[in-house]
Amino acid sequence: MAKTPLEASYQASLLRRLRKAYRGRILATKTDPGMIQGIPDLIIISGPKYALLEVKRSATASKRPNQTYYIEKFGIESFTSFIYPENEKDVIYEMCDWFGLDFELFLKES
């Protein structure tokens, strides 16, 4: 299913800001939504650790089948979260803590 323009543009903006803030420190990429239904939208890798983020246009946006399953499944040994504009700073702060990255670098890009 195609993403709404709002979600797609938010996702692109988030990915761009992450890549710029942590250039050389992370690999951040989108997943292919057509491959496995429910796999989170973004994969961020830093050293031996990884994070999976499921991007939503808002806190009230509906979740698709299997999204919660994959967030919980991979969250056991990695960082996973739903992310939307209302919780962005909290999620990125926690992700930076997980990776050992400086959260202030992201704030400079926001």
PLM regions: where:
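Catalytic phosphate/metal-binding cores of nucleic-acid and nucleotide-processing enzymes, i.e., regions
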Residues: M1-S110
